[in-house]
Amino acid sequence: MFKTLQRAFQIKDIRKKIFYTFMMLVVIRLGSQLPTPGINASYIQDFFAQNTGEAFNLFNAFTGGSFEQMSIFALSITPYITSSIIMQLLTIAIPKLEEMQKEGEDGRKKIASITRYVTVILALIESTAMAVGFGRQGLLEEYNFVNAAIVVLTLTAGSAFLMWVGERITEKGVGNGISIVLVINIISRVPSDMTTLYEQFVKGKSIASAALAVLIILAIILALVVLVVILQGGERRIAVQYSQKMQGRRTY
C-alpha cells in the first residue's frame, strides 16, 4: 500500500489531483466552522442538549457537525443526494428523461444540470423551513424577514457550494467528489464520537472495567470492518446456460 502511494506521488498528474482534493477538503472543513449570520448560538446548544435522537445524530454526522454548529454548511450535500435519488426515480417514471439518459454524454449532462436546479430548490425549501419553523422558537437572534432571508440564502449558497466542490473534485481531483465530501464529514465526527464513548464507558471506571469496555468496543469495530469487507468482496457465481443453435450437423 505504501509503495502504491509512493508511486502515485511520483506521477505529477496524480500528485496534482491529490493536492487539489486535499485543498478542497480543507476549504470544506474551514467553512464548517463559520457560523451562519443571525443565528442564536445558545438556542442551538439547548436544542441539541434536549434532542439527542438517532435521526438528529445521523443527520449531524452526514454534515460533519455543521448542523449542530449551524454553520454555513449546515445542510451539507443532503439536498444534492435527495435530488439525485429523485432524478433516478423520475428517469424510470418519465419517458422523456429516460430517453435523455440514453442520449449518451449530452443526455447525462442535461440530467446533471436538472439535478443541480432541483438541489437548489430543495435547499431553499429546507432552509426556509428551518428559518421559519425554528426561527419562531428562538433560532434567529431577531425573528424578522431580513434575518430569515439571510439565513435562507446563506444555507442555500453553502449547500450549492458543496455541490460545486464535489463536482470539481470529480473532475479535477481523485475519486467521486460527492462521496468524498460525505466521507470526510463522517470521519470528522470520529474524534468526538470516541470522546463520547470514553466518557460513557471508560471514564470513572475501574481499570478492569475500562479495559473490558475498550476491548468490547474494539471488537465491535473490527467485526463491523470485517463484515463490510466481506459484503463488499462477496460474490455468488451463477451458472449461465446458452441456448443451442443447430447449423447443419453441428451444434453451437
Regions found by a protein language model. Name each.
Residues 1-101, 105-252:
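N-terminal cationic and glycine-rich segments that engage phosphates or anionic surfaces
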